[in-house]
Amino acid sequence: ITPIACQCTFPESHPINHDKPLLNTKSPTYKHVLIPTDVPATEWPSKVELVPGSLISEFTSLKRESLDPMYPVMISNIQVQDPQGDVLVFPDNEWHDVPYVSKFMTGNLTPNGIPQKGIQNKNQYVFICGHAQRDIRCGLIAPELAKEFEHVLRHENLLYDKAKNPEGVKVGIVSHVGGHAYAGNVLYFDKE
């Protein structure tokens, strides 16, 4: 398999720190809520949670009153093919429709809540931070990384295809994750 050459050039004002160790640099989270959006990642504002009327805005505004700070919940927008609900929650690995955000948060995102059952996710996911308005390097490198992941997964017959491989790996873009020492941070979620 021939790798695709990355044609990215980053602004000199935004270098990548190649010396800082990556292992165990992410803060632990209790849950990660991923919210599909039709807005292309190239159009996401720097702070997606401040977009009035958006689902991520509603989740973010209720976080303090609905969640336990001892059990941190990360909330992100995603751009992904064929979402199966309003939100995808890990490590629960479930898609949910969320008619009442506050009720969903206290039931599904707290350790003592009474969760509503969702639809079991059947796919693995690779999400790449492509939030250009937050970090231009991510906006530049994410499309290249996505192409490479899709290229390799297609070659290995693992890439999602609605007709041919409905349980395949989906590759998508996620809003800002990680610090700014790196660019194009990659999240992998197994279906197990």
Residue ranges and their predicted role:
Residues 1-192:
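Histidine/cysteine-enriched polar flanking segments
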